[in-house]
Amino acid sequence: MLALICGQGALPTRIVKNCYMRPLIVSLTQFQPDELVPDINFRLETLGTLLDLLNQREVTTVCFAGGIRRPDINSTLIDEFTQPLAASISEAMAKGDDGALRVMIEIFEQAGFDVIGADDIVPDLLPSVGVLTKRLPTLQDQTDATRGHAIIAGVSNLDVGQACAIANGQVLAMEAYGGTDWMLNSLTERVGSWPLGGVLFKAPKIAQDRRFDLPCIGPETCQKVKEAGLSGIVIAHAGVLVLDVADVIAEADRLDLFIWVCEVPL
């Protein structure tokens, strides 16, 4: 049986719709998924109890999907089943996002569960290489994409973010704790401070475990890119999830944006 460990956003719903049998829906109490009613809510302080419940439900496979911000840990709420995991949880919370997620995956694997990625369930979340839209990237857009890849690769070991905005070779913004939406919103507030144009570049971190926390885009990403004054979106092939690809392409075409799925390194 599959358990879907859900965060916020549309990805968990997309996965459930693609499953021939409904998975067990599990959610962190602080981060509820869109349009889904969890079968189990839990806190990190009760993670050990969750692992026991999953075994009781005969769960064998786990998939993590959706957005999660790092929650605060209240040591007084750690229950007896979670006490043996307390040191590992504390270690995870002290790391960057990628490091924290690696520790969490290890906890589930050591408990006997197979951990799979969202694209193992929904392969078409990863579109093929090429330009998906009517609009094509210019030579400058391609140069900016190359610059974007170099930047994301360069900061990967710092475990910072998975996206940046580049225009005419200049870094307009970098993704950090607030995520891509926050980054794009910060550009929207400053539109007019530079010539319009540029790209949103998204890619996973170098050596990232791709079963967890792959970057993603959806129709709303296109809207925010347009509002930020950028010309299009460049994503790394097999490294960025595209929710409802037909809707994303239609929205990009409507807004006269390009979407380019490229092999990296460029």
PLM feature spans:
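Conserved mixed alpha/beta catalytic, RNA-binding, or beta-rich assembly cores of soluble enzyme
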Residues: 5, 11-12, 98, 118-223
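Short coil/turn connectors at secondary-structure junctions
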Residues: 1, 20-23, 36, 57-60, ...
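Long amphipathic alpha-helical segments
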Residues: 43-48, 61-78, 108
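Feature captures the catalytic cores and cofactor-binding loops of soluble hydro-lyases/lyases
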Residues: 28-57, 76-92, 96, 182-266
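A short acidic, amphipathic alpha-helical/loop segment
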Residues: 13-18, 63, 224, 247-248
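Hydrophobic alpha-helical segments and helix pairs
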Residues: 78-139
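General beta-strand structural signal in soluble alpha/beta enzymes
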Residues: 4-6, 25-27, 62-65, 93, ...
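N-terminal basic/disordered segments at the start of proteins
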Residues: 1-28, 45
